[in-house]
Curated annotation (Swiss-Prot):
This is Rubredoxin-NAD(+) reductase. Involved in the hydrocarbon hydroxylating system, which transfers electrons from NADH to rubredoxin reductase and then through rubredoxin to alkane 1 monooxygenase. Belongs to the FAD-dependent oxidoreductase family. Signal peptide: none annotated. Coiled coil: none annotated. Gene3D superfamilies: 3.30.390.30, FAD/NAD(P)-binding domain. FAD binds at A8, G9, T10, A11, S32, R33, I79, E156, D275, I293. GO terms for cellular component: cytoplasm.
Amino acid sequence: MAIVIVGAGTAGVNAAFWLRQYGYKGGIRLLSRESVTPYQRPPLSKAFLTSETAESAIPLKPESFYTNNNISISLNTQIVSIDVGRKVVAAKDGEEYAYEKLILATGASARRLTCEGSELSGVCYLRSMEDAKNLRRKLVESASVVVLGGGVIGLEVASAAVGIGRRVTVIEAAPRVMARVVTPAAANLVRARLEAEGVGFKLNAKLTSIKGRNGHVNQCVLESGEKIQADLIIVGIGAIPELELATEAALEVSNGVVVDDQMRTSDTSIYAIGDCALARNLFFGTMVRLETIHNAVTQAQIVASSICGTSTPAPTPPRFWSDLKGMTLQGLGALKDYDKLVVAINNETVELEVLAYKQERLIATETINLPKRQGALGGSIKLPD
């Protein structure tokens, strides 16, 4: 019997790493539906898109990590069911893998468009390395690029595309970009910087249809009636947690697989971590599903400590980062229910610091191009009493 980990992204690979760090001696099997060794996903929406030399993404761990730590990894292995009674997962090819403990690190998939024309050639999504390779090829062939969604991923892709001379328009349904992630001050500075680089923005704008020519996208039609030329449409409108396995196994699910503070699901032999998990976050003070590297690594460490019976790591504030056309954007803490913002901005140097307070307690920070300052602020964010 072994610990089986379904999903070999950041959460899954780090779970295997921490299990060995905490002294687990049994078998560990990583199951990945992809065809390549586990890799880092953040660069896919940044430098990888415009690189002329990178043939593959940066590995999460060197191949020697898996052999040296006696971690078995199976590629091209799509798990389709869990038999909780027999403690077995079954792959699409019929192969079965028995588990003592099962860790679901299945991640999330891109939210798909459903409007007229959404199936035309030239409508692209970005989640995997294959997606990134396909998108990189299409960027070379395209003059006019429309990015649907003004979140972090959408703006990273827009930044990369305008950097290689493409005409780029971002369509966002909200009144501002990154509305769910950062304060208006940070959003406005990012938007102004990208506009100066040539990125166009359509805010409060809703896509109603996509028109094509000879089976390929040609233009986007907005609710206002405006039509925008598009040789390539990149969709970044959020992600949906992969819940099929958990649902089929009758685990409790909501906007994610529901887990306790030890990452256990409603079946105590099964855990869930990373983008697919809905967990209580002490800094947010509620159940949340976070799609960040920090969250994936943190939950991987928690699940390993739980299985190995070691003390649970002390909670650390949520964090994220992004690179956007000469801007390093960093966020720390839970930007929620604040009652005071202290903003310092330098438009000439493109630097920003935002401190968010709740009842005089610092709960979150944002910085642009101030990495040392962000690092210094990290220890100032404490859990509520």
